[in-house]
């Protein structure tokens, strides 16, 4: 069994819970809010649909120290991703972290150094990476079908205001 802890739901943590039916070897062993009062609606609804009742912990450090999971899902405030990721990697815990990994280049260097000195793996939540439009573009680029790329700009559009759950 791959034991996974979820810390927060401020971005894409639900990509993990929604994949659980296809991942019988994965067990959610604990979860916590990444900041006081953080709504965990999507993740908790997914737990309920799947009949899961993993224990809640007061914070991610208490959780990972108590459970020693294989993987920590980092999905808190952007300003906390760097520290949460480095703490998990220092403990040999694999990290699946939402973007951004860090807010500064110095912070990103710290994350890189933590990953390089750890036995654990670091994976950023590039959730659209294998969507057909991105995957096709990557294949065309790799095959040299569109020539040398000199500039690339892209934007995923979001509606202004609050998004529906």
Predicted regions located by residue number:
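Rossmann-fold dehydrogenase core element
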Residues: 110-128, 148-152
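N-terminal Rossmann-like dinucleotide-binding module
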Residues: 1-50
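Beta-loop-alpha module in the N-terminal Rossmann-like domain of NAD(P)-dependent dehydrogenases
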Residues: 52-114
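Predominantly a Rossmann-like dinucleotide-binding segment in NAD(P)-dependent oxidoreductases
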Residues: 128-165
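A short helix-to-beta-strand connector/capping loop
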Residues: 48-55, 117-121
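Short, Asp-centered acidic motifs that coordinate Mg2+ and/or phosphate
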Residues: 30, 70-71, 151
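Short catalytic-loop micro-motif centered on adjacent basic/acidic residues
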Residues: 5-6, 73-74, 95-98, 122-126
């Amino acid at each position: 069994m791959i034991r996974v802890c979820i810390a927060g739901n401020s971005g894409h943590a639900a990509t993990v819970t929604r994949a659980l039916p296809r991942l019988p070897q994965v067990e959610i062993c604990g979860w916590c809010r990444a900041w006081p009062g953080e709504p965990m609606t999507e993740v908790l609804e997914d737990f309920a649909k799947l009949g899961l009742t993993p224990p809640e912990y007061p914070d991610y450090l208490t959780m990972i120290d108590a459970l020693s999971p294989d993987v920590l899902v980092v999905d808190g405030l952007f300003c906390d991703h760097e520290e949460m990721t480095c703490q998990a990697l220092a403990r040999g815990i694999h990290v699946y972290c939402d973007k951004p990994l860090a807010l500064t280049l110095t912070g990103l260097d710290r994350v890189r150094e933590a990953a390089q000195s750890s036995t654990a793996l670091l994976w950023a939540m590039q959730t659209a990476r294998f969507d057909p439009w991105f995957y096709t573009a990557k294949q065309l680029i790799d095959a040299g079908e569109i020539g040398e790329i000199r500039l690339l700009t892209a934007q995923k559009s979001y509606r202004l205001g609050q998004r529906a759950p």
